[in-house]
Amino acid sequence: MTSPKDVLRKNLKLIHGCPITYAFANNWEKIEQFQSRPDDIMIVTYPKSGTTWISEIVDMVLHDGDVEKCKRDVITAKVPMLELALPGLRTSGLEQLEKNPSPRVVKTHLPIDLIPKSFWENNCKIIYLARNAKDVAVSFYHFDLMNNLQPLPGTWGEYLEKFLTGNVAYGSWFNHVKSWWKKKEGHPILFLFYEDMKENPKQEIKKVVRFLEKNLDDEILDKIIYHTSFEMMKDNPLVNYTHLPSEVMDHSKSSFMRKGIAGDWKNYFTVAQNEKFDAIYKKEMSETELQFRTEI
């Protein structure tokens, strides 16, 4: 029987060439064989791109903005993470998904190549939320400081090098966003940008409403915007991850919901780091029309 201490602060494990959090990487065939339902809705993000934010928005849209219904459980139960496994600590994502009624909402950080094939076979709707790489790198660094399921991040400079080479959980940010952007040409994928959502949440939430074939009036939309604002979510124990054991997430090192802004990278990148990042970014993104804003 695996105990929590067996999976904490372990090196990432390669699954089909992609580095995956050690605790999640056992029994991978169960992930591959996962049977989706045709009305499943999948939320996909690269880590630290607004996953919890869009998850709560989708839950509120599906429940017509009913705040009480959305308080029915913690976010990790309402929107289970497909690959989540915390041996000896809590229900796995797969076990939680089996319990949840349809239409289920499932979240994942997996790259396209690791998505269970049943999601493609069932033509499940997918919402992909992308965030600019500089802010993701800073947020991921702080996340790895407090998330004991991840390897220790080292210094910010050391971590940035790992991020740029894709030697972090879920691999290369560049490959992740580019492949999902391309995939939307042949699959029902709503591709959203974190920066657009910060700038004009109503406009972006309306896209979610249309995509999920709901019909919500302005009053309900305003309620959803209010209840999914960063300030409200940071103080909401159902979504701010304080419900997880401190041996897994140590909020004394960094809070799960830290700042929730665009442009915080400027407080961390040195001039040299920024120049190197920009050069690699230009090369990696040269073949795609996908564009990001690093501030709003």
UniProtKB/Swiss-Prot annotation:
Reactions mediated catalytically: a phenol + 3'-phosphoadenylyl sulfate = an aryl sulfate + adenosine 3',5'-bisphosphate + H(+); 3,3',5-triiodo-L-thyronine + 3'-phosphoadenylyl sulfate = 3,3',5-triiodo-L-thyronine sulfate + adenosine 3',5'-bisphosphate + H(+); 3,3',5'-triiodo-L-thyronine + 3'-phosphoadenylyl sulfate = 3,3',5'-triiodo-L-thyronine sulfate + adenosine 3',5'-bisphosphate + H(+); 3,3'-diiodo-L-thyronine + 3'-phosphoadenylyl sulfate = 3,3'-diiodo-L-thyronine sulfate + adenosine 3',5'-bisphosphate + H(+)
Keywords from the UniProt entry: Cytoplasm, Transferase
Main location: cytoplasm
Leader sequence segment: none
Keyword Membrane: no
Expression (tissue specificity): Expressed in liver.
Positions that bind substrate: K107, T108, H109
Family membership: Belongs to the sulfotransferase 1 family.
Name of the protein this chain belongs to: Sulfotransferase 1B1
Species: Bos taurus (Bovine)
